């Protein structure tokens, strides 16, 4: 199960009819067993909150029309994009990368953990989402093919982004099926079943579970490469230097020591 976040968008202040309609909708979704996050706002209220709260700014970047007055939805999207033009892209990027650093500190700084966190770990889904949010804010694009058209990614990188995204979502869905509940950590005891479900058979000298985990770590590394590539573009094209981007890029720098290579403090 995953959370569903809904914004009930009002053309004016809430009326008794609107309140009843929203309440009935929520009860219906709760009866289905869904976990629903929800907010009820007018366009002006949404824009005001977006200016004050980075979490709301981010969530509204992903907003899409589901049902109701489509003209109101279009008006909201137009007004929201105009609001973004007045906000600092450097500050938004700084906030997203700060969140990424804090998240990975909690989940584990290495992408090669024995029990990786597929959502919040290094090279996980949230890293790809963070890249999409930053490019959406700065360049009005969040999908790999659009990033290619805007010159943010080359063709191979665009293909890699989509491949990584599809793989990680597939693994996450299977993980939820195996655990029979929301779960983000690929536990050691579940990895063999995961490999079997995803079609990783044993081969000479290599177990299916080993093949699966090798593939997972390869994907996580490719997500890291995408992060470096997009961050370098952002730093180059944003006029204001962003400290966290410089820090993120420095992580990938290598230093040769006699007989070894040091990469981000690791041998």
Describe the function of each predicted region.
Residues 1-267:
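A nucleotide- and high-energy phosphate-metabolite-utilizing enzyme signature
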């Amino acid at each position: 199960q995953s959370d569903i976040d809904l914004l009930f968008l009002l053309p004016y202040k809430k009326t008794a009819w609107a309140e009843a309609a929203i309440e009935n909708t929520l009860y219906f979704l709760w009866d289905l067993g869904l976990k629903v996050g929800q907010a009820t706002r007018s366009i002006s209220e949404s824009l005001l909150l977006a200016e004050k709260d980075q979490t709301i700014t981010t969530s509204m970047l992903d907003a899409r029309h589901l049902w109701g007055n489509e003209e109101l939805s279009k008006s909201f999207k137009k007004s929201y994009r105009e609001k973004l033009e007045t906000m600092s892209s450097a500050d938004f990027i700084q906030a997203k990368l700060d969140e990424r650093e804090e998240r990975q500190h909690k989940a584990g700084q290495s992408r090669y953990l024995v029990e990786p966190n597929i959502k919040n770990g290094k090279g996980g889904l949230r890293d790809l989402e963070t890249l999409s949010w930053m490019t959406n804010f700065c360049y009005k694009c969040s999908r790999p093919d659009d990033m290619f058209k805007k010159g943010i990614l080359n063709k191979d990188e665009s293909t890699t982004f989509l491949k990584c995204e599809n793989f990680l979502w597939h693994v996450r869905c299977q993980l939820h099926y195996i655990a029979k509940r929301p779960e983000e950590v690929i536990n050691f005891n579940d990895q063999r079943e995961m490999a079997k479900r995803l079609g990783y058979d044993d081969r000479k000298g290599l177990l299916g579970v080993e093949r699966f985990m090798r593939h997972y770590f390869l994907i996580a590394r490719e997500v890291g490469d995408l992060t470096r590539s997009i961050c370098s573009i952002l730093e180059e094209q944003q006029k204001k230097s962003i400290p966290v981007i410089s820090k993120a890029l420095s992580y990938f720098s290598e230093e040769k020591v006699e007989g070894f290579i040091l990469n981000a403090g690791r041998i």
